[in-house]
């Protein structure tokens, strides 16, 4: 009996390249998952050298922001090459405007988790992935209304 090869649906990949809403959110979420995971590992390794909760939260925000910015720029440039660098700056501007909310939620929740005795790396993951979910929802609603995703 002959078996047919397994075929994976290409719909998500097609949507990634054709839908701005899906593309921008996928790039940001992937960049934030990568940056949050890397930051959690870095903070967990450095925790003994970071003297206070405030120092941990501050270093977390700086490391996470730097990694996220670099990863997103690479992903967005790959997926939107035809739109040029100005499109990258336009989307990054929206991210920078929303960054205070992202880091207020992420840092605030991380600080509370540290105060509750949660390990630093786990606190980073919970706090910053929660912040991503909140800010992505707000940005998506704004982007649909403002025309960013057209």
Protein language model features and the residues they cover:
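Membrane-interacting alpha-helical segments
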Residues: 2-150
């Amino acid at each position: 009996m002959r078996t047919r090869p397994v075929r994976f649906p290409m719909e998500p990949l097609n949507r990634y390249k054709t839908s701005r809403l899906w593309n921008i959110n996928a790039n940001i979420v992937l960049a934030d998952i990568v940056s949050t995971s890397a930051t959690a590992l870095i903070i967990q390794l450095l925790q003994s050298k970071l003297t206070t909760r405030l120092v941990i939260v501050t270093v977390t925000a700086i490391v996470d922001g730097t990694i996220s910015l670099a990863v997103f720029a690479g992903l967005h440039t790959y997926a939107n090459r035809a739109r040029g660098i100005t499109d990258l700056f336009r989307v990054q501007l929206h991210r920078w405007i929303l960054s205070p909310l992202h880091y207020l939620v992420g840092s605030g929740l991380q600080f509370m988790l540290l105060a509750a005795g949660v390990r630093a790396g786990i606190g980073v993951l919970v706090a910053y992935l929660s912040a991503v979910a909140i800010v992505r929802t707000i940005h998506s609603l704004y982007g649909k209304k403002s025309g960013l995703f057209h």
